[in-house]
Amino acid sequence: MEDNLARAVEIAKELERRNATNRMKFYNPYPYQQKFHNADAQQRLLMAGNRVGKSFSGAMEMAYHATGKYPNWWKGRKFTQPIRAWVGGVSNETTRDVCQKELVGQPDDPSAKGTGSIPLVDIKETIRKPGVFFFF
């Protein structure tokens, strides 16, 4: 009985880890986010209130472009070949605390790599540099 319970706990933890490191699989945008993603324009603006998902929407879009894994509902621009892209913020702090966190996970926690919008299986390597963070 204890072995079964321990095994069930082990399986539950592994499922939780897999879900946490593949947020792309579970992204279900709100209508305003989907409208933004599907807009076919060279320049777009997502303007909304505080803490409603603007940064994560942008991170998800970057993750789709960086990985080439577009969801079925996607009507926006699709890249058919690998891309090189830069993501930045107005300061080192916002780049680290917002952009990096939303893309690859909590910057000060190496075990959180892959808990952002880019799935862990798609992150080959990360390199920490003062003021800059690279991922491949």
What do these predicted regions represent?
Residues 1-136:
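Phosphate/NTP-binding elements of NTP-utilizing enzymes
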